[in-house]
């Protein structure tokens, strides 16, 4: 009986290894198909983890927090196909603790970010969050972040050339006479491609044609830091601009935004005629200025500036880096033991890898030739990634290192 048990224990590992060799390829294909379908379903289906609930003491509680959902909605606007990758310079008015600039600097294509705030203490306390020391990973494109102190209504010359203007929860804190100056500074002085204002006020739906776009319910007045006169003043000033600008409604996929539509609304003023503009010609250009901009308009004070290190790479190098990172991610997802020589191959659909480089190219044949030229095996639109050679080299190198260390220790011991 004991001999039989020992025999079963001896052959158990061999049996499991054989079954793993037979079933692992089918499991990998099935897992990759599930992974691919999950990526595709993320854009189509709403996130079930986004919801809101009511608490008797705290009121409405949002998951994730409301400011995170608002930031996500603004980023969705900036990633619109009409100007995605074309926004070189962006200004965030009233950024306070720089919580949104941390998201803004990850948007592709942006090379310059301006932060303007009237308060000095939050600027000095929060500016260390954007530290870019020598240990930070290098970016693909240059990025400069400038923190400025001043009134957002002042037409400072550094605002010239901004492609996007963002003001999050700011207009309800401004004085009535500054609101009118702000509108003229944004739409008459800067003249960006896109302007985004957010406010906790209960706006009427812009698409319905109601001109009182900033009218809100009286029961929410005690929660705001502004008066009815301030909001109506801003609304009255913007009414004259609606005839010259195309107003788009922000359609957000998250259901919670629809449920709390009476609490928050975003105005996205898209300057008409964007497609007709020459990309090489600045929209802010005024022929009365000539070639020199009015640099005498120095209203803001520089608090701090950051220049992030960057490394210029070719498109082929960027494609290879992104594909390599995606392969490593899938390998770490599939393999439990990276040193196992039994799990020696992984087949990755080429179409799945194209999703990671779609912002660079959509030429499948070019990517296929690039992978084959760099040593990857592509068979029937499947990239064959083998780790057998890598694992053998790793194991052998470790054994050699151990042997060398043992020999050296022996020599030292006997000497």
UniProtKB/Swiss-Prot annotation:
It is found in: Cytoplasm. Its cofactor is Mg(2+). InterPro entries: Hen1, SAM-dependent_MTases_sf. GO terms for molecular function: metal ion binding; RNA binding; small RNA 2'-O-methyltransferase activity. Belongs to the methyltransferase superfamily. HEN1 family. Methyltransferase that adds a 2'-O-methyl group at the 3'-end of piRNAs, a class of 24 to 30 nucleotide RNAs that are generated by a Dicer-independent mechanism and are primarily derived from transposons and other repeated sequence elements. This probably protects the 3'-end of piRNAs from uridylation activity and subsequent degradation. Stabilization of piRNAs is essential for gametogenesis. This is Small RNA 2'-O-methyltransferase. It comes from Bombyx mori (Silk moth).
């Amino acid at each position: 009986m004991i001999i039989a048990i020992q025999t079963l224990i001896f052959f158990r590992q061999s049996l499991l290894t054989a079954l793993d060799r037979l079933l692992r390829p089918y499991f990998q294909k099935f897992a990759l198909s599930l992974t691919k379908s999950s990526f595709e379903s993320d854009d189509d289906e709403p996130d079930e983890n986004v919801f809101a609930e009511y608490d008797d003491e705290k009121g409405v509680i949002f998951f994730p927090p409301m400011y995170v959902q608002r930031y996500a909605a603004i980023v969705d606007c900036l990633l619109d196909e009409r100007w995605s990758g074309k926004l070189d310079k962006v200004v965030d008015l009233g950024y306070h603790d720089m919580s949104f600039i941390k998201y803004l600097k990850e948007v592709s294509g942006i090379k310059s970010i301006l932060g303007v705030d009237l308060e000095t203490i939050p600027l000095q306390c929060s500016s260390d969050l954007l530290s870019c020391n020598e240990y930070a990973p290098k970016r693909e494109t240059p990025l400069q972040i400038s923190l400025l102190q001043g009134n957002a209504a002042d037409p400072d010359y550094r605002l010239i050339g901004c492609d996007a203007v963002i003001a999050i929860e700011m207009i309800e804190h401004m004085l009535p006479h500054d609101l009118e100056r702000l509108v003229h500074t944004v739409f008459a002085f800067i003249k960006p491609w896109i302007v985004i204002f957010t406010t906790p006020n209960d706006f009427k739906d812009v698409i319905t044609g109601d001109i009182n776009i900033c009218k809100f319910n009286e029961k929410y007045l005690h929660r705001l830091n502004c008066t009815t006169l301030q909001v109506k003043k801003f609304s009255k000033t913007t009414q004259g601009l609606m005839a010259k600008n195309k107003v788009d409604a922000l359609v957000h996929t998250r259901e919670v935004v629809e449920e709390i539509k009476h609490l928050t609304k975003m105005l996205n003023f898209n300057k008409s005629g964007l497609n007709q503009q020459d990309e090489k010609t600045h929209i802010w250009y005024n022929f009365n200025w000539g070639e020199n901009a009015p640099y005498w308009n120095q209203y803001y004070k520089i608090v701090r500036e950051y220049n992030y290190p960057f490394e210029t790479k070719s498109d082929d190098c960027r494609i290879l880096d992104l594909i390599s990172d995606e392969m490593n991610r899938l390998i770490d997802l599939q393999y439990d033991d990276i040193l196992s020589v039994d799990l020696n191959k992984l087949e990755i659909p080429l179409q799945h890898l194209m999703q990671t480089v779609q912002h660079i190219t959509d030429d499948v044949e070019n990517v296929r030739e690039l992978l084959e030229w760099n040593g990857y095996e592509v068979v029937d639109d499947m990239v064959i990634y083998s780790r057998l050679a890598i694992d053998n080299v790793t194991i052998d190198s470790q054994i050699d290192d151990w042997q060398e260390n043992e020999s050296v220790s022996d020599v030292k011991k006997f000497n």
